[in-house]
Structure formats: structure tokens, C-alpha cells
Design a protein with these regions (language model features):
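Membrane-interface interhelical linkers
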Residues: 1-34, 64-89, 138, 201-229, ...
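C-terminal-most transmembrane helix of multi-pass membrane proteins
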Residues: 2-8, 263-310
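Hydrophobic/small/kink-forming positions within alpha-helical transmembrane segments
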Residues: 33-41, 68, 91-99, 121-126, ...
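Specific transmembrane alpha-helical segments of multi-pass solute transporters/efflux pumps
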Residues: 35-38, 75-112, 153, 233-248
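Transmembrane alpha-helical segments that form core, pore/gating elements
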Residues: 37, 41-44, 52, 67, ...
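C-terminal transmembrane-helix exit sites in multi-pass transporters
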Residues: 103, 120-142, 263-282
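Helix-helix packing/entry segments at the starts of transmembrane helices
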Residues: 113-119, 186-202, 239-270
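Hydrophobic transmembrane alpha-helices of multi-pass small-molecule transport proteins
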Residues: 139-155, 172, 280-299
Length: 310
């Protein structure tokens, strides 16, 4: 067997093959973006008929029916109550983020909500650095700065007063980022299915308590029932399908597919709710996406090179 040839300068090293495109992964991602769009539209429809917190309660009730099917299989893991304080903290943050996001969906153009939601990778990086000690690369710092510019383009502070609901959506993206960091820590001791079951079991009483305090229960109309089913089922399917996509396909391919949510929801908002298609919102969304995608792609490439040479 010939002796291995020493690696030459970095520029002479053979290029790594591009990540493979998986047909199954693409289909899973299309299911995910369809679920997120369905959840937003159903939330908008229900927000005209009932309080936001009631939407979250009904969403959790649908989730509880699904969790009941999983509970017998997961009971041995559930009864150990491992890391319960972390589950509780994660769901307090996630519940608040869901409330802010749903309120944003009710009050803002849907495309603006989705554009601002794409700032979540910024918050994940910052919270992972603060809570888990993960290193923030220079390109990630640059992505955070450019993403902030994209946020300013979306919000257009010079064009008048910023809608407070837009700040709520930014806060929800931060909350989802913090929740993702909690999930990253929880996966050391709990399966994804158990994390989802705990989410339903904890967030349902949170919603019921808040609903009792506000006294805002409104009896659903028959026309609301399909939207209740959609908002509950898509809340589960959106995250499940994305997890399945990322299991079989590189994130650098999956995330651009997910970004199609922004132009698609802009068209739906225009057709269904007469929302104008804003060039500033779309351009700002592209800036936010491009910054985070470039950083993610560079970091993934660095990891692949490290594995290839290690």
C-alpha cells in the first residue's frame, strides 16, 4: 500500500463534496413550512373570534390528545421526572414566546411576522454562548450585526412609529431561541418525544390559569372547529417534520427551503387579508436570512473539514 501523501497547503486540498440533497428531506421540509403557514393562518382566523390565550389552550388540548397516545410508551421515562426544573423553565419561556408570536400574527402583516421570526438563530447563538459556554465565531458575530441591519429594514424606524407588536415578535424570536437552548440541554437526558409531552402537560395548565385570571373564555363557533384542529395539529407537525428533515438532510439545504415561508405567506396575506406586499419587509427578510445562512454554512463547512482531517 503506498504511503499517504502529506497534505499540501490549504488552498491545494481537495474540495469537500457538497452536502447531499435528500428527496425525503425536501418533502419533510415542505411539510414543515406548510405546517408553519397553516398554524399562522389558523391563529389569525381564530384571533378574530377568541382571546389569544384561549387559542393557546385549545392548541394544547389538541396536543394533549396526541400526547395521550404517546404517554403509555413514554411512561417509564416520564415518571422519572428527570430535569423537571429545566422542563418547567423551558416551558415558561416557550409559552410566553408563543403568546407574543400569536399576538403578532393577529396584529401584523403575516410576512413581517415571519421575517422577524428568522432572527431566531441570533438569539440561539447568544443564549448558547451565555448559558452553555459555546464559542461565538467571528462570522457569527458578523451575522448578528448584519441581521440587526435586516431588522431595521423590516421595522423602518425612520418611516414612523414602530408597531409595538413587531417588538413582541422579536421578543418571541428571542424566547424561541432561549427555548431551543433549553431543548439542547434537555436532550442529554430526555427523548424529543418526552420533551414534547412535557410541553403539553405544563403549558396547558399555564394557559388555563391565565385564562381563568383574565376571564376571557369564548365558546367556539362551529366554524372555528376546523381552525382549532389545524392550529393544534400544525403546532406539533411543524416541529416534527423539521426534525425529520434535519435528520436526513444537511441544515444548509433545509434552511433555504424553510425561507420560502416568507414569500409564500406574503402572497397568502395579500390574497386572503389584502395585506400589501412590502418590498422593505421582503428585502429585510433576505438580509436576515442571508446573514444567518452564510454563518451557518461557514460553520458547517469548518466542522466538516475538521472531521475530514481529524
Amino acid at each position: 500500500m503506498p504511503a499517504p501523501v502529506p497534505a499540501g497547503p490549504a488552498q491545494d486540498a481537495p474540495a469537500l463534496p457538497p452536502p447531499a440533497i435528500s428527496t425525503a428531506g425536501v418533502l419533510w421540509m415542505l411539510g414543515s413550512l406548510t405546517s408553519f403557514i397553516g398554524m399562522a393562518v389558523a391563529s389569525r382566523q381564530l384571533s378574530t373570534a377568541m382571546p389569544i390565550v384561549q387559542i393557546l389552550v385549545l392548541r394544547s388540548l389538541v396536543g394533549l390528545a396526541v400526547a395521550a397516545l404517546l404517554a403509555p410508551r413514554l411512561w417509564p421515562e416520564l415518571r422519572r421526572h428527570r430535569d423537571f426544573p429545566l422542563h418547567l423553565a423551558r416551558n415558561v419561556v416557550h409559552f410566553a414566546a408563543q403568546y407574543a408570536w400569536t399576538l403578532g400574527v393577529a396584529l401584523l402583516p403575516l410576512a413581517q411576522v415571519f421575517a422577524l421570526e428568522f432572527t431566531m438563530p441570533i438569539w440561539v447563538a447568544l443564549f448558547a454562548w451565555a448559558a452553555l459556554g459555546e464559542r461565538v465565531t467571528r462570522i457569527r458575530i458578523a451575522a448578528i450585526a448584519v441581521s440587526f441591519l435586516g431588522v431595521l429594514i423590516v421595522l423602518r424606524p425612520g418611516a414612523g412609529m414602530i408597531n409595538p407588536a413587531a417588538l413582541l415578535v422579536l421578543a418571541s424570536a428571542a424566547g424561541y431561541g432561549a427555548s431551543a437552548v433549553f431543548v439542547k440541554r434537555l436532550t442529554r437526558s430526555a427523548s424529543p418525544a418526552v420533551i414534547v409531552v412535557w410541553m403539553v402537560l405544563l403549558q396547558l395548565p399555564m394557559g388555563l390559569a391565565l385564562l381563568a385570571l383574565t376571564g376571557g373564555w369564548v365558546a367556539p363557533r362551529p366554524a372555528d372547529l376546523p381552525w382549532i384542529a389545524v392550529v393544534g395539529l400544525t403546532a406539533l407537525s411543524a416541529h416534527y417534520t423539521m426534525a425529520q428533515a434535519l435528520r436526513v438532510m444537511d441544515a444548509s439545504i433545509a434552511i433555504p427551503i424553510d425561507f420560502l415561508r416568507v414569500p409564500l405567506i406574503a402572497v397568502i396575506g395579500w390574497l386572503a387579508y389584502a395585506e400589501p406586499i412590502s418590498a422593505a419587509v421582503l428585502f429585510g427578510a433576505v438580509v436576515i436570512f442571508a446573514a444567518n445562512f452564510t454563518a451557518m454554512r461557514a460553520e458547517a463547512l469548518a466542522r466538516r473539514r475538521a472531521r475530514a482531517t481529524g
